Amino acid sequence: MLVWWGATALSFVVLVASTWSLVAARGRVVEPHQLPANAPTTLIVLGAKAADGEPGTYLRNRLDVAAELYRAGRVDRIVNSGNDSDDAGREVRTMRAYLEAAGVPAVAIVDDPIGMNTAATCRRSAEEFGVRRALIVTQGFHVGRAVGLCRAEGIDVTGVIAPCDGCTGLSLVRNYFREALLSRPRAMFNAFGVGQICQRKGRRGRPVR
């Protein structure tokens, strides 16, 4: 009986969290070519796996979208947010190097080296960098949660879907399951102020509009 009740409770939380993610992102998620004319010009790039100075598949696709939007004149400032520790592969340093190699000038890039997770990225973008309107780029399975968390921090945000060229089917399935069972419920609780995710505070960065 306890197992049944536990499974029922888990299913309920997963359903509510998925609904929260869908509602939070409704009308706020687009493909790169669908950006409206009045879209924000600040773009937040969420960090992901990096190793040996090279972005992993998920991160590379996000950065390619960021570089494309900058070259097209759709954004003028890019906030790279991730875990820049040695253990995490120096995500932010790798992101900057990749974007600069793709033609994005150094002055257009803002580094957030302690965006340890999506919630921390959204909170720091608002509190440390003064972001009020922004685009945020990530893969489709992640974008609803990212939009919901940034909206909870008061950012008028639009999610931009990055492709997943080169992603394996197994990794996609794993990420979709993790998103549904773990990440969305945790994000929903965080967005409503339950179980706030602890994070370190860095130095206050330049305001980004």
Enumerate the predicted regions with their spans:
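A transmembrane-helix-recognition feature enriched in membrane-embedded lipid enzymes
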Residues: 169-199
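Electropositive, surface-exposed helix/loop patches at the edges of structured domains
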Residues: 6, 114-122, 142-150, 192-209
